[in-house]
Curated annotation (Swiss-Prot):
GO molecular function, one term: pyridoxal phosphate binding
EC primary class: transferase
Needed co-factor(s): pyridoxal 5'-phosphate
Reactions listed under catalytic activity: L-histidinol phosphate + 2-oxoglutarate = 3-(imidazol-4-yl)-2-oxopropyl phosphate + L-glutamate
Protein name: Histidinol-phosphate aminotransferase
Entry-linked Gene3D superfamilies: Aspartate Aminotransferase, domain 1 (3.90.1150.10), Type I PLP-dependent aspartate aminotransferase-like (Major domain) (3.40.640.10)
HAMAP family associated with the record: HisC_aminotrans_2 (MF_01023)
Gene field: hisC
Similarity comment: Belongs to the class-II pyridoxal-phosphate-dependent aminotransferase family. Histidinol-phosphate aminotransferase subfamily.
A Pfam family this chain is assigned to: Aminotran_1_2
Length: 362
């Protein structure tokens, strides 16, 4: 194992960066708080005055609940405004503009490339391979591209959006080994709850160049709350916390998220995940029988990527039936594809009905 530390990969000018010390980060105690220029009165729209004060930057109860959920230490976890903020923090914290590259695997979630562009970090693309088992990551090619470009960050979306494929844990570990001391491998597990592949978080004890992204937006149904987690080496988490905006987690969102992680709420979430997985299999089996459907990719997420003979006609037929899906036709290599989120059984039946009626009318 390499003796290099992940902190050697951080931008030189940020290693001693203190960041902004907000009033809420001080350890002072008292019953009259006049240190943050907040209002002494609540707003009429907030009868219990629960939002008149700035929030805890990293709410302790929520952070502990998330760490327990994901099986990591609290000091290894940073809460942010969705995974988007964590992606941005990683790129800004590690990549020197116009020097340190970011590796991505298109077609894939677009925010990796957006954050790289905003940081002026060179972008290296290693496209997913379209094979008999679906669109999947070519991990050896990804590793080689990262080494050739001297990349600082490698983003592996698993399960991948929009492809739906998951990367075996052994392949992720191989990438971590090959890139230790050279690059941070970021495994985006936004759809991890729907996958058969175990989380990469368990590898963190052996590889300090691993970072994992998780979210409450998908399986936990809290998309508007914007609660994302970055799980990584504790020193790296502390550094990125100093790079983060002062108050990233609004109090109402933190309260709701902590309630969503109670045992009864988690039991409901698990039942819904089980139902989504069953509906995913049912919808997949039904779609492959629909005339005009060219290919339905296997998926480990809560969606299906579908190729059509006429994707425009399929998109319009669904829209006319009141069903909005994600049009992928502008994405390179997906000019005939739509991404369909798994809904309720009734919603999925509406998808099938609209596509079947389109073919009957043709």
């Amino acid at each position: 194992m390499s003796t290099a530390s992940v902190m050697d990969l951080v931008r030189d000018d940020l290693r001693a960066f203190a960041g902004y010390a907000s009033a809420r980060t001080s350890a002072l105690q008292g019953d009259v708080w006049l240190n943050a220029n907040e209002s002494a009165w609540g707003n009429p729209a907030d009868p219990d005055a629960s939002t008149r004060r700035y929030p805890d930057p990293q709410p302790k109860g929520l952070r502990a609940a998330l760490a327990q959920l994901y099986g990591c230490a609290t000091e290894q976890l940073l809460i942010g405004r969705g995974s988007d903020e964590a992606i941005d923090l990683l790129v800004r914290g590690l990549c020197v503009p116009e020097r340190d590259a970011v590796v991505v695997t298109p077609p894939v979630f677009g925010m990796y490339a957006v954050c790289a562009r905003l940081q002026s970090a060179p972008l290296v693309e290693v496209p997913l391979v379209d094979g008999a088992d679906g669109l999947h990551a070519d991990v050896p090619a990804i590793v080689q591209a990262a080494l050739d470009a001297k990349a600082k960050l490698v983003f592996l979306c698993s399960p991948s959006n929009p492809a739906g494929s998951a990367i075996p844990l052994a392949e992720i570990e191989a990438a971590l080994q090959a890139l230790q001391g050279k690059a941070v491998v970021v495994v985006d597990e936004a759809y991890g709850e729907f996958s058969d592949v175990p989380s990469a978080i368990g590898l963190l004890a052996r590889y300090d160049n691993l970072a994992v992204l998780r979210t409450l937006s998908k399986a936990h149904a809290l998309a508007a709350a914007r609660i994302g987690s970055l799980i990584a080496n504790a020193e790296l988490i502390a550094l990125l916390r100093r790079c983060q905006a002062p108050y990233p987690v609004p109090t109402p969102c933190a309260v709701m998220a902590e309630q969503a992680l109670s045992a009864p709420a988690l039991a409901v979430t698990q039942r819904r995940v089980t139902e989504i997985r069953a509906e995913r299999a049912r919808l997949h089996a039904a779609l492959v029988q629909v005339a005009g459907v060219r290919q339905v990719y296997p998926s480990q997420g809560n969606f299906l990527l579908v190729r059509f003979d006429d994707a425009e006609a399929a998109f319009q037929a669904l829209l006319e039936a009141g069903v909005v899906v994600r049009d992928q036709r502008a994405v390179p290599r997906l000019s005939d594809a739509l991404r369909i989120t798994i809904g309720t059984p009734d919603q999925n039946d509406r998808v099938l009905g609209a596509l079947q009626r389109k073919q009957e009318a043709a």
